[in-house]
């Protein structure tokens, strides 16, 4: 009978699907499918490309971490020394191997050591990479992001001081040196804080720290998501909002700064933005003799703050 494997003389071949032996364990299927796609060269253990990739990974692990967008790397011997003298809260001082130890390098290392700042000697190529090949003179100082206060914290600081609030808000100020100088003036004349917009404004960078001469470590700087809305809120809370502009309709001599006040400073070029100007209780100008049309923003802020401080002492 055809197909009867029990008949006499029949021989069963090994590996057939008939009888107790079923399947081949996938051998035939794998044989038909082949070995699949060839992996990339860098994933083949014995390929030169894989060896190069492994070597590069090991070198990357030994390198100092590249600074992120949130940190700042101050470069150059003079800027680094100035930041350290101003007590900028740095986290690491990078020194390129083979850097000549002149007076500035020696001072930077000494201040960093006395301040508990990590001192890392790295290959010059690593510092080149971290600085995007900018001129660093063998020194780099890593500065963490500034810890901004909330706008309400400025009012709380004034309340704790027991004096009428004296705040400064910046509008269209993009130069961090102006910001640092204003922070320094606010601290010098008894102010309680500085408010800056979250966008399109200078921020507290290492340059601002250095210009503030350390005042940024003592005076809170807050960021407002919407400057105009924050100023309105402060006005509703009893603060006088005083804009500072060369075209102001009130002179500084006429300003009464003895009560709670926030001085809004615009840039030398653009001045105050339209919405901010419209929401000021007064827009003040500084009387000047001679042909000078305007003052630098930080200088103008210092003049107004000095006058308010004089009034409060009287």
Curated annotation (Swiss-Prot):
Positions of region (Disordered):
1-73
Name of the protein described by the UniProt record: Uncharacterized tRNA/rRNA methyltransferase Mjls_5122
What keywords are assigned to this protein? Methyltransferase, S-adenosyl-L-methionine, Transferase
Protein family:
Belongs to the class IV-like SAM-binding methyltransferase superfamily. RNA methyltransferase TrmH family.
- Report residues binding S-adenosyl-L-methionine: 266, 286, 295
In which residue ranges is the amino acid composition biased (Basic residues)? 1-16, 49-65
Q: Does the entry feature the keyword Transferase, yes or no?
A: yes
Q: Which InterPro entries match?
A: Alpha/beta_knot_MTases, Ribosomal_eL30-like_sf, rRNA_MeTrfase_TrmH, SpoU_MeTrfase, SpoU_subst-bd, tRNA_m1G_MTases_N
- Output one GO BP term: RNA processing
Q: Taxonomic lineage per UniProt? A: Bacteria, Bacillati, Actinomycetota, Actinomycetes, Mycobacteriales
> Which terms does the record give in the GO molecular function aspect?
RNA binding; RNA methyltransferase activity
